[in-house]
């Protein structure tokens, strides 16, 4: 029904009336023009053929005067052929007074020469001695054409001696008329199109002010006061439009102030680093920013309209009345999956009359702070524990020595030996802690050198092989020299830590394997150090590089470990743009993998 409504509009009605007037005018002009043009073209065509025929008549009369009727046939044939070279001429015949065809220009009709013509128009021209014409349809091989037949009698000494019969194709005239009509139709169509377009614009100048005021009225009813009605004149409609604009402007200014404050508040809430939740006076959530949604791990549609205390899982601990009385902050686990902890502060929205209209909860993410605090406490506890154990042991032995054990020649050396071992263990622990502290503060310098890795790793293996007799070392190292760039002292510490652990935890026929594999495509090499020890449970493999972590604390402490060796090794390897990780099968052994950058340098390359 929308099109019907549009059709009934004042704008459309004006355009339709305007177009109909143009169509009627163009039809009248076109009819008058085509009729007169057709008459003019036909008259010109017939006039040309008539003049042409008269020239031919004069020529034939001369032939008859000179040669007579008996010897004139050949010359008349030549005359007809000469005059028949015009495009519009279909055929010319000369027929004598006895209606015998003397000559013809059409080759296919040469057989009709010396035969009698039975055309009634020819008989009429010969009998009356007057020219005549008529239209016929005739096929010249390309389809039927309109043909204008013209007969003109030839007189010598005022006696009719014959008749000139001319068939002229008049199709070109009608084709020309059709072309002109087509041009006129196209011109009319273009004129109508332009008329419609102009009609819309012209009608628009009349209906636009009324339409604008109608639309403005609708928009104002919807609360939109931004539009303005264009004033086209100083008449009554223009005055009405001016009144509309003044009304819209005043209301818009008041609304703009409100919207500006609202947008400013929304922008602040949206871009805050803290989560914001605002509720109505009943505690139902009405506003929540993106940060709060991220902290809660919820979508906006899953939280709007729900009770704030229920969303924060506090309905059993707090009531809305308590929030008004107590503004203290507290910690809250918001997202257990991500371990997110937030400090929550509540406040109330109160009118000047004291009426509470809503509540606001501010969520501040303190997860990182809590994590740092927890790690600090764990570190202090671990260091305290690691120092307390040897100190307690040393204190016990020193007390025993003070009580007289130093006199016992067997016990005194043992007590002193244990005290020395515990002292050395504490020194190692303190040194490891100092090194870790330097790495954390990035104050531990790394002095890189280009190293022949084959020679480097073999030297370390040889040293450990000479220091023990109960462990077999198996080497799978490429013969081709691999060069790398690292701090030899730091990497020696890494390999010593890994090899020492492999030797400590191997059992039975102790065996430590070394496998070195190079990937030239990525300029990386992988070192695998495998033992046949007790192995590590699969759920604890990733934790062995944590500080102070021990799979078996009693066994590790008994063997003199501090729990920091692999943690230091990881820091050193990563500082060399490398990676270290472990694979283990419990009861079968553990493999430590180390990847480092490397280069394959041919012997001749050093000479460049």
Curated annotation (Swiss-Prot):
Protein name, per record: Sensor protein kinase WalK
Start and end residues of each PAS domain: 261-331
Membrane-protein topology: Multi-pass membrane protein
Binding site for Zn(2+): 271, 274, 364, 368
UniProt GO molecular function: ATP binding; metal ion binding; phosphorelay response regulator activity; phosphorelay sensor kinase activity; protein kinase activator activity
Biological process according to GO: osmosensory signaling via phosphorelay pathway
Keyword presence, Transmembrane helix: yes
GO cellular component: plasma membrane
Keyword Hydrolase: no
Assembly and binders: Forms homodimers. Forms homooligomers.
Major subcellular location class: membrane
The species this protein was found in: Staphylococcus aureus (strain MRSA252)
